[in-house]
Structure formats: structure tokens, C-alpha cells
């Protein structure tokens, strides 16, 4: 049964377009904390698979380093792009709550099949190898489909537990994104320590089975909190938001030859009020839709267009971001990983330092730096989201420069045939800087795309944020394939040779640092001219 405003009032209190099932007790930190725990369980499951995926592909499945890295990037890119479809279905038809439940079920099925695929004997015959690979990749992409609905909706559903019109809850909403990442990083840190050890030292089947149980727990906990949630009523009594925005573009195109006088006379009073706002002075060609569209609908279309330059210029950051679970891990596998005689640190565990740095820095940022900055800027988030994103992009470039320098030193040590290999601890600084970079950019992008899209499109807004990582992974995969082909010609060693001591990851890292710097320059230019679509800029 569709919820109407009259029935909403009978069920509970409606605030900022949200339905409270229990008046004065629904939503807020009580519900948000549960959602943080729910996603912690999901992140444990996802990174229990993703963190060590390249080691499984190059190990039991026998793929080359370049092919495995390309497969990881392609899958990660798919995981990041499918939320666009999931967000569309949630915002247009299913709603976030139902989408989370359906996608969680698919997610659990995919993880279960993934664990099953590792039990199939892979070396008995060619047919058994083919069967194992088929089930493995089918289940891997079923997990991606589950992620497509789950990931954009759970974050938005958590943020929706706060009323943006209430000053205190608006600050809490900004803080929610920080603590969501804090919880996620604790979970990711745990799974990288536990799951990767089990996978490499005990059993891949058990190592992939534990994430299945974790995701089952996530769904159970989410359903447990049903009566305490606020549910969005933004779409009640309104047209499909995609249809509204599409209509604006179509009408603007149809009226492109209409005299300006006709446009000025359309909804004249409303036009004068809206054009006083700076954001309405951008993309004036869309004002031609005012003859048949409401001015609020035109502003929604403009808000979506303003996101495109920020989306494009953030992609270079995500190309850099794609290297930590692939080449950083393979790089670490060639180094001295011994802690004590007989005890080696799994290479994938090194990624834990990214999460550890986030866990350490987020409380400092949220409790010290944000209040300090807020006293000067009067911004509820301390600094604007674009400033936060830009800081993270700069740090990612710095991390890539450091990675190139360390790899140059590692290659020198390997080619000098030193009796003691270079210690893996040389990689820790680049992981730590990456972690701090993620804390700024990942949270900043979440806040930005949540706050700058029309309120009815927040699932799609979060999906746009995730799709940046998809674009980065796809472009990284494409770059690797092209560079591998070019550098492998005429009998030369590829930059990504299976023997990393003969490869040139240092050249690749320098290339990424240069691309990152160019992208950062363009980002600064677009960010400087960006006009926020709301006074509340998170």
C-alpha cells in the first residue's frame, strides 16, 4: 500500500520528508549506530573477499599478474558502477529499505556460491578447472549485483535518520559520515588480519565462508531495527524524479528557438525569486524549459549538471586508489615480511595500515579539527566538502610519489642481489598517507554527493560517488593492459612482468603521480567556481 501524507500522519511524525514510526523516538543516533554496525558486518564480508582476491587469482586459479590485476580492477569497477542501477531502482520504484533487503539476499547467495567454488577440485581435469572458474566468476559478479543495490542505499538510509532542518541533527549528520567510515575501517582492518591469514594459511573455502556468515548477520541486524527507523516520504505524491529531470532537458531542447520574452513571462514571479540565487545563473539554456516546467524542476536539473565536472576531475584520484589492493600487495609479497622466525605477514595484511591510519585519524579530525575549523568558518562540517576532497586528492599524489621512490629503492636492492631483501616496513608510509587521503576524499565525496543532489535522488547521488571508483578501476585496468602490451614488445620486459624484480612499477607510479597532479589542477579550477545548491553544504 502506498503511503500518503494523511496515512503518514496517522502512523507517526513526518520531519524533513521522513516518516517516524515512533514519534520522538525514531531515527537519530540510536538508529544510525545500528546502521553503522550493520555496514561494519557487510564491509567485513566484502573485504574478506576483495582484499586477497589478486592472491587467489594468481595462486589457485593460476592467472598472470597483469591478467589478475586487470580482472580485479574490472570486477571492482563493476562493483562501483552497478550502484547507479541500484540507486535508480531504489529512488524510482522500490525505496531504500526494500532495496537493501533484496540486494542483501543476492549478496549472501553470491558469497555462499563463492565459497562453494573453492571446494571444487581444480587440478583433476580441464573440465573441473573450467567449472570452478565459471562458478567463481559467476558468484563474484553476483556479489557485485548485490553490492549495486546495497551500497548506495545503506549509507543514505543511515544519513536519513537525521533531520537536516534541525541545526544539531544537521551537525550529527555530517559527523555520521565520519563515524561510518571509522566503523567500516575497524571492520576492514579486522577482516584483513583474520580472513587473509585464514585464506593463505588454512583454507580458501573457510576464508571465503566466514564473509558469508558475516553478511547473513548484517541482514539480521538490519531487520532487527525496523521499528526504530525513519523512512523517507520525499516521493509521496510526486512524479518520478528521473522523469521530471529528463523532461527539463527535453523541454529546453524543444524551446531552444523560443524568444526570451516568452520564457521571462512564464511563471514570472517565481522566476524573479529563483534567479536571485547565484546557482540559477548557471546553465541558463535550461531556463527555456520554464515555459512548461516548474522552476524547482529546472533547479534540480541544474544541480545534477553541476556535479559532472567534480565527478570527472575526481576520477584520477580513484585510478591512484585502485593500486593499493593490486600492485602494492604484489610488491609487498616480494619483500622481507618476517616478524619472527617462521612467522610471515601476509602481503594483503599490509592494506590494514590504510584502515588503521583512518581509525586513528578520524577521532582527531571529528573531535578536534572540525570544531576548531568550525569556529573560524561557521561551517557545520568545519571545512567545505570540496576543500576536504581536494586535500585528499593532494595526499594521494604525495603517496604515489613516495611509492615510486620506495619501488626504485626496492628494485635497486633486488638487482644488487643483496643477501637480505628489503623490509616490507618500507611500504608502511605510503599506506598510511593513502589512509589519511581516503579519510578526506572518500568521506568528502559521500557528503558532497549526498548533499548536492535533489533529496529524492540521494541513492543515485551516493551511486554517483561510488561510480567514480568504478571509472577509476576501469581506467586503471585499461591503462595496465595498454602499457603491458606496449612495454612487452620487441623482447623487452613489461612494466608488469610476473617477476617484479625485472618489472618497472616505479615508472607506472611516476606516471600516475603526473596524471594525479594534472587532474588535481583541473579539480581546483572547477571547485573554485562551484556553486553549492544548498546553504547546508554537506
From Swiss-Prot:
It is a multi-pass membrane protein. Gene3D superfamilies: MFS general substrate transporter like domains (1.20.1250.20). The modification Phosphothreonine is found at residue 99. GO terms for molecular function: dipeptide transmembrane transporter activity; low-affinity nitrate transmembrane transporter activity; tripeptide transmembrane transporter activity. Its main location: membrane. Expressed in shoots and roots. InterPro entries: MFS_trans_sf, NRT1/PTR, POT_fam, PTR2_symporter_CS. CDD domains: MFS_NPF5. GO terms for biological process: nitrate transmembrane transport. The chain crosses the membrane at residues 44-64, 74-94, 100-120, 134-154, 175-194, 204-224, 308-328, 342-362, 389-409, 424-444, 463-483, 507-527. The keyword Membrane applies. It is found in: Membrane. Belongs to the major facilitator superfamily. Proton-dependent oligopeptide transporter (POT/PTR) (TC 2.A.17) family. This is Protein NRT1/ PTR FAMILY 5.11. It comes from Arabidopsis thaliana.
